[in-house]
Swiss-Prot record:
Binding site for Mg(2+): N312, D318, E321, D322
EC number: 6.1.1.20
GO cellular component term, pick one: phenylalanine-tRNA ligase complex
Species this chain originates from: Pyrobaculum aerophilum (strain ATCC 51768 / DSM 7523 / JCM 9630 / CIP 104966 / NBRC 100827 / IM2)
SMART domains noted in UniProt: B3_4 (SM00873), B5 (SM00874)
Family note: Belongs to the phenylalanyl-tRNA synthetase beta subunit family. Type 2 subfamily.
Name of the protein in question: Phenylalanine--tRNA ligase beta subunit
Domain of life assignment: Archaea
B5 domain residues: 263-334
One Gene Ontology term from the biological process aspect of the record: phenylalanyl-tRNA aminoacylation
Cellular location(s): Cytoplasm
Lineage of source species: Archaea, Thermoproteota, Thermoprotei, Thermoproteales, Thermoproteaceae
Quaternary structure, from the entry: Tetramer of two alpha and two beta subunits.
Keywords: Aminoacyl-tRNA synthetase, ATP-binding, Cytoplasm, Ligase, Magnesium, Metal-binding, Nucleotide-binding, Protein biosynthesis
């Protein structure tokens, strides 16, 4: 899960609370203090609350729980005098902008802005493929702003540079250029250009020194571009409400032009009795309203009003979860079922334990991934898809563990990797327990995988046989099907699949179904 870095003093300033009080309140939010270095905290937050990816979002939630500020966060909406003129950019057709006025920034505030930007890029933005975000000092921009293509021969001063360079040089000279220029037409990339002709940003690669945010900035322009209209709007909502925590006047101006942005609250009609039954505790109407407001929602005639930055709230069940969180899980009733029973381990659990011991003894490292995953799993099987995913990271129910292991090996960036996972996958409409392992090193072959499976079957006392098999994602003639008391497959992964998953080392994988 995402881990964010915040200063204790900044959280204290944003909430008006002492750190000792803040630490106690973490029991009531979806977050956990991972480490405390004295002046700074590392806080683990959940993927479904991207508004918690910075100190401002955490402060907003904490103030609600502490009843310092309750109900919908205050916002004063208006129309900006800045105009956006947008061309049709096929690879990133959606763009929305807003200005947050009267912000007070210091070094820590700018750190939090950058952290929120990068965390959204990494998770919700799918590594800038789905959305890209920019911040600009309004006082340094001459409107109107043009969203159009430029030439790679054009010059600008990239962030961190002292003098102008050509855009094509920026691709090679900067880490961002090397990493993200492949997402766009490199010869004629999309950019924001103001009326004076200065390039504000090459999207989604790197911004410009010309209008960067500093501690002297008072009015911040936010832009979000992307491939999905809803994702662009959701990201802009999160960014607006985050910066509002630094604004004295709570003024936000929506920039007209492009695909636009509509600030809208969501109404969810909630049956209070259903919430009480769902949580197993009777909640009086007055208390229900109190909990709703502490969660930074509002209540009107049977409907709960959800602010636009709470993109994880999709139904009354999500509202019930927030009620439980702000009420405190320690308020939930606890009962021991009055059912006499003699427990024993299920056969699948016995095999799972022995499999783990065996894999660890053979030098493998165990991983634990989520059952919900992204579209990459479709490289090796046909997954069931989530109808209303909250994030591009969790759009499918995994039908294989293989792609998650390859992605993990890619992230580790080692020349030799031996990893495994035991967990659930869905095959042919049924949930089954699977063991998957990966061997990644120069010279890795099918023989390496066969050796591990044979050793495993021998240790477990299981009979297994091997037969030739083929799959699109495997190298031709380099795959074996496992049959017997356990079933599955072993294969050398096709380099094209490895490239798609950003892994460059020869790799052998296996997946065995053990229960």
């Amino acid at each position: 899960m995402p881990v964010i870095d915040v200063a204790k003093s900044d959280l204290e300033r944003l909430t008006g609370l002492k750190y000792e009080e803040i630490a106690k309140l973490f029991e009531y939010i979806k977050g956990e203090i991972e480490s405390d270095s004295g002046e700074r905290l590392r806080i683990e937050v959940t993927h479904d609350r991207p508004d918690h990816f910075s100190a401002e979002g955490l402060a907003k939630t904490l103030k609600g729980i502490a009843e310092i500020e309750v109900g919908l966060p205050r916002i004063s909406l208006g129309r900006s005098s800045i105009r956006l003129v947008a061309e049709s950019i096929t690879e990133r057709p959606y763009i929305a902008m807003a200005v947050v006025r009267n912000v007070r920034l210091d070094e820590e505030a700018i750190k939090q802005m950058i952290q929120l930007q990068e965390k959204l890029h990494e998770t919700y933005g799918r590594g800038r493929r789905k959305i890209a975000i920019g911040f600009y000092d309004v006082s340094k921009i001459k409107p109107p702003i043009y969203y159009r293509r430029i030439s790679q021969e054009d010059e600008y001063i990239p962030l961190g540079f002292q003098k102008p360079v050509k855009v094509r040089e920026m691709y090679e000279l900067t880490e961002q250029g090397r990493r993200y220029s492949g997402l766009i037409n490199r010869e004629n990339p999309p950019a924001l250009v103001d009326a004076s002709g200065q390039i504000m940003v090459v999207i989604p690669v790197l911004g410009s020194e010309c209008c960067k945010i500093t501690e002297a900035t008072r009015d911040v322009l936010i832009d979000v571009t992307g491939t999905d209209h809803r994702a662009v709007a959701n990201a802009l909502s999160i960014l607006i409400y985050s910066l509002l925590e630094r604004s004295g006047s709570k003024e936000v101006e929506i920039v007209e032009g492009g695909t636009g942005y509509s600030h809208e609250y969501v109404k969810i009609y909630v049956d209070e009795r259903a919430v009480s039954e769902f949580l197993g505790v009777k909640i009086a109407h007055e208390d229900f309203i109190k909990y709703i407001k502490k969660a930074r929602f509002d209540y009107q005639e049977g409907a709960v009003i959800i602010p636009p930055y709470r993109i994880n709230v999709l139904s009354w069940v999500d509202v019930a979860e927030d009620v439980a969180i702000v009420m405190g899980y320690n308020q939930m009733p606890r009962e021991v079922p009055e059912i006499p029973s003699a427990g024993r381990r299920h056969r699948t659990e016995v095999i799972t334990l022995e499999v783990r011991k065996s894999m660890l003894s053979m030098g493998f490292t165990e991983l634990n991934n989520y059952v919900l995953t992204d579209e990459a799993v479709a490289e090796v099987c046909s997954p069931a898809r989530v109808a209303n995913p909250i994030s591009e990271l969790y759009t499918t129910i995994r039908c294989s563990i293989i792609t998650q292991l390859i992605s993990a090996a890619s992230a580790l960036k080692r020349r030799e990797t031996k990893i495994f996972e035991v967990g659930e996958v869905v095959r042919e409409g049924r949930t089954v327990r699977a063991l998957a392992f990966l061997i990644s090193r120069d010279g890795a072959t099918l023989t390496d995988g066969l050796s591990v499976v044979k050793s495993l079957c021998k240790r477990l006392g299981l009979k297994c046989e091997f037969f030739p098999a083929e799959a699109k994602w495997a190298l031709p003639n380099r795959m074996a099907e496992v049959r017997g008391e356990i079933t599955g497959y072993i294969a050398e992964v096709n380099p094209d699949v490895l490239t798609a998953l950003k892994h460059a080392v020869p790799t052998v994988v296996a997946e065995l179904y053990i229960g």
